């Protein structure tokens, strides 16, 4: 009987650790995505040739910067250390953007914004559906409408950029 109780306790401990690990993974991925959005947004604000793309970049830098601050405060309250960098995948995307100019930059940036926001929407929905920490889930719920709005605007601008780059 004591052995069964030990296994049950161990199982519950592993489940709790797994849940914490999933919430921690969400925070880390959201932080990396947020860092990438700010960097790419600042780049677009300075480099885009289309005024709407430039404005979108400024909005991304500002709004994701504010979200990053909220996320940092949340992570600190949970004792979770945020990553120091945006990660290799995001860095490669940023390097490609830095090497691209003119209308091609605008189109590439907007395509990257659609893809990045689609991934972030899914990440947020996954956390809302299966996250264990109420505060982390609440953060995801709070951010979802904004990220969905960014995605909608990115898709709209991507359509414009595709049409403009074919002429």
Q: Could you tell me what each predicted segment is?
A:
Residues 2-167:
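His/Met- and acidic-residue-enriched segments that coordinate or traffic transition-metal cofactors
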């Amino acid at each position: 009987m004591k052995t069964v109780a030990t296994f049950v306790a161990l199982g519950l401990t592993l489940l709790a650790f797994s849940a914490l690990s999933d919430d921690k993974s969400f925070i880390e991925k959201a932080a990396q995505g947020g860092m990438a959005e700010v960097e790419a947004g600042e780049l677009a604000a300075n480099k885009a040739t289309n005024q709407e793309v430039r404005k979108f970049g400024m909005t991304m830098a500002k709004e994701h910067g504010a979200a990053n601050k909220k996320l940092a405060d949340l992570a600190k309250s949970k004792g979770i250390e945020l990553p120091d960098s945006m990660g290799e995948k995001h860095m490669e995307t940023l390097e490609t953007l830095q090497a691209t100019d003119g209308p091609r930059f605008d189109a590439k940036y907007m395509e990257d914004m659609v893809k990045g926001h689609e991934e972030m929407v899914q990440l947020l929905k996954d956390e809302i559906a299966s996250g264990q920490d109420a505060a982390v889930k609440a953060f995801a719920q709070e951010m979802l409408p904004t990220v969905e709005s960014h995605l909608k605007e990115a898709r709209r601008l991507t359509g414009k950029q595709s049409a403009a780059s074919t002429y």
